[in-house]
A protein has these predicted regions:
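Short, aromatic/His-centered strand-loop micro-motif at the edge of beta-sheets
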Residues: 112-135
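Flexible glycan-contacting loops in extracellular carbohydrate-active proteins
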Residues: 156-187
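Conserved blade-ending motifs and adjacent loop-strand segments that build the rim/top face
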Residues: 389, 442-455, 488-518, 554-556
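Glycan-recognition/cleft segments
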Residues: 83-112
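Localized edge beta-strand/strand-to-loop motifs within extracellular or lumenal beta-rich domains
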Residues: 132-146
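Short, conserved, GDST-rich strand-edge loop motifs in beta-rich repeat architectures
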Residues: 177-180, 357-361, 407-424, 468-479, ...
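Beta-propeller blade signature
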Residues: 367-378, 420-436, 478-491, 536-554
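Extracytoplasmic low-complexity segments
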Residues: 22-52, 198-243
Length: 557
């Protein structure tokens, strides 16, 4: 927590080893996020996806047969039945693959217009899983076919009289008698057509950076076109924020926390706890007894060791714990604090310590660093950093290494007084928690566009980068971008690496934060804004990590 339409995409294949820290959790992983995503039953038939090789014209293969390879990723939706592909010979004989993820099943159907179809299927929940790439290979021989699905072989006969006129269609089909609007919820990539000896005739990587003109994508060997209708590209998820959900909160100043292990976002009002799970896409609500500490910025976090929520207040040494069994807080009364608004916080799970920095209240910007030791001290200790770093709020905080934090930007004044020339800060500091010292790493030149930060930053030490949500703080109707800054550099700049999210900035009454979820290697932006009748609106957005650099941006709502 204390953490480009593209004209051209630079990256053909993302094989990035990442080393970043979020909530004190260090992760290293590889990402291969590309492919063509098919729109299915969630849209009307006119907007479902097709991939038609050679624009629907027949392809000729050797008389002895050919091999088709591709990777597929099935996704869970309300309706999971649909065609993966149809292979059609002489507009008469066919071999189809049909998926039904609900039963972990893929069916293979072979038939023609003048005889009864033959059908076999693979139903295996250990092999056919949602949201996982798996290889499929189909070997066509003169009278039979061998289908290998994620390593499992299936055999059946077919009635193709030859391979001189073969049409191949993925997803929706409008080809005569082979019309179908049922599309499997899927993504595909690495599509190749080969000889039985392994010589590749055609290859479509399907990463959007391949040779593409209008709705056609061309294979990398012979420039054979494939027509894409209503397609979406997996790689777009690295620069377009996807709206995950939104819901109303029955309180004007809700509290926010995230459990990165289970993927739960917790939002608390003064009476209820809202829990949204990003894996299952479910929202649960429960009423509780007592209340968390309340204020205009979040003062709640998820304790990963105790696996529950805690609420904190710098004026109370006793922490406020949530008991999920009794649905109650350990503090029965409602306590509201107006100081220390929009402070940064970081929980060091390795040492079981909570750190707070900065904030605003009573016309004063804070330069204090607070520490709470949950192991033995059980009280707040304070260190003033005013002489080392100008007091501020609306900054971003992220863990750099053990006992070292990065403080990025913000708004405040050199003296801490609101009336004493308040200004935006475009700087980066390294804060040593052991020594209480602060080192200024750089300061950007003043920009014409004022901007501040979301509460948390994601630090990627391998690429020498720090990521934060940024937005203008000199207007009400503004927009949030994900921005990248180099940590060690002599020429610091802000690089926008996403499109935008509309944001209504009402100073301390609006709040946005950035989280990393290791299970789906994605960033999540959570926005809390005032709504009608003293309530709030929570919006959650998702971006695949690492982000890509766009040449154009567009607003989304």
């Amino acid at each position: 927590m204390i953490f480009h339409r593209l004209h051209q995409i630079i990256i053909l294949l993302i094989y990035l080893s990442l080393s970043a820290t979020s909530y004190g959790y260090t992760f290293e992983h590889k990402i291969e996020n590309y492919g063509l995503t098919f729109a299915t039953h969630t849209v009307d038939q006119d907007h479902r996806t097709s991939l038609i090789l050679n624009s629907g014209k027949g392809i000729s293969f050797p008389a002895e047969g050919f091999i088709m390879n591709f990777d597929i990723k099935l996704r869970q939706e309300l309706y999971t039945y649909g065609y993966i592909l149809r292979v059609i010979s002489h507009n008469d004989q066919n071999l189809d693959l049909v998926s039904y993820l609900y039963d972990s099943k893929i069916s293979i159907i072979s038939g023609s217009s003048h005889e009864k179809s033959q059908m076999v299927y693979l139903a295996d929940s250990m092999l056919i899983k949602k949201d996982q790439w798996m290889p499929i290979q189909i070997q066509f021989f003169p009278n039979s076919a061998k289908i290998k699905i994620n390593g499992k072989n299936i055999y059946l006969s077919h009635s193709f009289r030859d391979f001189n006129d073969v049409q191949i269609i993925f997803g929706a089909s409008n080809l005569g008698r082979f019309f179908s609007g049922d599309v499997a919820p899927m993504s595909i990539r690495n599509l190749s057509l080969q000889s039985l000896q392994g010589k590749t005739f055609y290859y479509w990587k399907l990463d959007r950076s391949s040779k593409t003109t209008n709705n056609f994508v061309y294979d990398s060997i012979s420039d054979l076109p494939a027509y894409v209708k209503n397609g979406k590209w997996e790689i777009d998820k690295h620069y377009h924020w996807q709206r995950v959900t939104s819901f109303e909160i029955d309180y004007k100043n809700p509290q926010l926390a995230f459990d990165e292990i289970k993927g739960n976002f917790f939002v608390a009002s003064d009476k209820k706890l809202y829990t949204y799970n990003v894996n299952n896409k479910t929202l649960d609500t429960l009423s509780f007894k007592g209340a968390p500490f309340l204020g205009v910025s979040s003062q709640m976090l998820f304790h990963p060791l105790k696996k529950t929520l805690l609420s904190y207040n710098i004026y109370h040494n006793k922490l406020n714990w949530f008991n999920p069994t009794t649905s109650s807080w350990s503090v029965n009364q409602k306590i509201t604090v107006d100081d220390n608004q929009h402070h940064n916080r970081f929980f060091d799970k390795d040492h079981d310590k909570l750190y707070l920095y900065g904030g605003y209240g009573r016309h004063q910007y804070s330069g204090a660093l607070y520490e709470y030791n949950l192991k033995d001290n059980f009280k707040w200790s304070q260190m003033n950093l005013d002489t080392l770093i100008s007091p501020r709020y609306l900054s971003a905080l992220g863990k750099y290494s053990d006992n070292k934090l990065l403080v990025l930007g913000g708004y405040g004044s050199h003296s801490g007084k609101q009336e004493d020339f308040p200004q935006n800060f475009y700087d980066l500091y390294l804060l040593n928690l052991n020594t209480g010292t602060c080192k200024k790493l750089w300061e950007m030149n003043h920009t014409d566009e004022h901007f501040v930060m979301g509460n948390s930053a994601i630090v990627d030490t391998l690429t020498n980068s720090i990521y934060a949500l940024t937005y203008r703080n000199d207007c009400y109707n503004t927009a949030i971008y994900l921005s990248q800054f180099l940590i060690k550099t002599n020429r610091p700049i802000r690089q926008i690496v996403s499109d935008s999210i509309l944001y209504k900035f009402r100073d301390i009454y609006s709040y946005c934060d950035l989280f990393y979820h290791p299970n789906d290697t994605s960033l999540y932006a959570v926005i809390l804004e005032p709504s009608k009748n003293e309530s709030s609106l929570c919006r959650i957005y998702k971006l695949a990590f690492p982000p890509l650099i766009p040449t154009k941006t567009s607003n989304i709502t």
